[in-house]
Each structure stands twice: as C-alpha cells, then as structure tokens.
C-alpha cells in the first residue's frame, strides 16, 4: 500500500510539473496577438473579457492552493498566470479605444477586486478547515467553467465571419492538452475540484480545434482589415457635409442627359480620369485639407466614391 501510495504521489507530481509547463504555454499562446496589438497600436476589436476572467481564476486558484495543503504546484502556475494576464491587460488598456478601456476597467474593479475581496472575506470569516477548502473549491470550479466557456463568444464570431483570425489554433491545442494533464493530476491527488472543470475544458478545446479545421481554408465573409468592425456590429459614419456632397453628386449625374449638363461641364466616367487634373478634397474627422493640381486644356472630374459636376472645376471626394 505504501509503495502504491508513493507511486501515485510520484505520478501526481509528474503530471503537476507537466501541467505547469503546458499551462505556461496556454498563458503564452496569445503572445502573437498582443505583439500584433503592440505593433499596430490597436486592439482591432479583440475583447478583454477572457483575460479578465482568466486573471480572476488564477487569483482564486492561488487562494485555494494556499488554503489546501500539498498544492504547491497550483501556487506556482497560477502565480505566473497572474503576472502574465496582468501584462496582457496592461497592453490592452494602453491600446484599446476609450469605451473598451472603460469596460475593462469596470470589469477589473468589479470582478478582480470587488468579488474576489468579498469571497476572501467571507471564506476567512465564516468558514474554517475543510469547510473553507470545499467552499473555495466549488467557487473555483464555477469560475473555471466560466473561463472555459469564455471563448464561446469567439466561437460564435468564427461561425458568423467564417474566419479563424480571432481563434489561434495553438491556444485551442494547448487548452486540450492542459485539460487532460490537469484532469489526471486531480484524479491522482483525489482532488475533485481540480479534475472536474477540466472535463469541460477538454470538450470546449476539442470543439475549437474542430471549428478551426473546418474554417481555416474558407474565405472570410469580410475583409481582414474590417472584420473586427463588422464583428463588433460597427458602421462607418460619414460627416454630414460629406453626405450632402454625395447627394449632390448623385443628383447631378442622374440629371445629366447623355453625359452633359446645361452649364457646359461634361460628366466623364471614372476610367477617363486624368490624374494630373484634380482638385482633391480629403475629409478628416476634424478638418478638411484641399490640394489643387490644375494642368492641361480640359477640365475633367474624377470621383472616388461619387462624381460631382461643377462648371470649370473638378472635385475629388476621398472618404
């Protein structure tokens, strides 16, 4: 019996070390995403929710490991996870739009400070010994299930856009591997709170990998540069004066019989444009810059989005 117990302990320690290494890979798998965020100085529609929830989960598991004896391997990996997730969130807050920063800050205050503080206070004051371990264990199980379910929004996004841009394969692969290793660790340690949530983690990880294989060769429904905006349900809004210019252009083109209007100006197709004969109007969020380039005998008009007819002048509206 003593030999079997020692062998079980050895295997548990081995799987614990493997779990630490693989979980570290899981924590580091979003690095390409955040390198891209750093390089482009934009979060490009990526959400912070999975990272906030993961940080909260690491904090709770560290607390659980401190309360439960013989769980040092849980302390090490979750401590490292807290540091890594904090770095990710700091980068997100640095480059996200104001609305996303505010939402992330509210989640951090409410979840990682508020709720964690309440849980710590209640378990310290109202429970002791094994009861405290069990209360914390079930809380950790519930939060871990939330962490594994957090990518559901990404799965929905992949199905809608038919693009795997927002779901790295490496993350899904390491989630499956991590779930298997930690399940075996919990089984050998007879810790149901560690083993149970990793069953669902394995299922979600396999689902993500299957989705990646299904959509990796499909053409996205939206262009890569605009997929984030489409995914977020955003719509490009033009200034009112640009809309008025577009309306005038449409009316002028529609009213011109056989390519001419009464004032003598001609309506030319976009293909007939001469680049050297342009008056360009670039529309900015705050100001309008005009660049005039006049050359040649005729006065032609080139319009990128719409054509505007005006005597003796050609106008380009670039939106």
Curated annotation (Swiss-Prot):
UniProt-listed InterPro entries: SWEET, SWEET_rpt
Cytoplasmic side of membrane: 32-50, 94-106, 156-167, 213-319
Subcellular location: Cell membrane
TM spans (from-to): 11-31, 51-71, 73-93, 107-127, 135-155, 168-188, 192-212
Entry membrane topology: Multi-pass membrane protein
Keywords from the named record: Cell membrane, Membrane, Repeat, Sugar transport, Transmembrane, Transmembrane helix, Transport
GO function terms (MF aspect): sugar transmembrane transporter activity
Keyword Ribosomal protein part of the UniProt annotation: no
Ranges in the topological domain labelled Extracellular: 1-10, 72, 128-134, 189-191
Gene Ontology cellular component annotations, sorted alphabetically: plasma membrane
Key word Repeat present: yes
Domain MtN3/slv: 13-99, 135-219
Functional description taken from the UniProt entry: Mediates both low-affinity uptake and efflux of sugar across the plasma membrane.
Complex and partners: Forms homooligomers and/or heterooligomers.
Family: Belongs to the SWEET sugar transporter family.
Protein name: Bidirectional sugar transporter SWEET15
Source organism (scientific name): Oryza sativa subsp. indica (Rice)
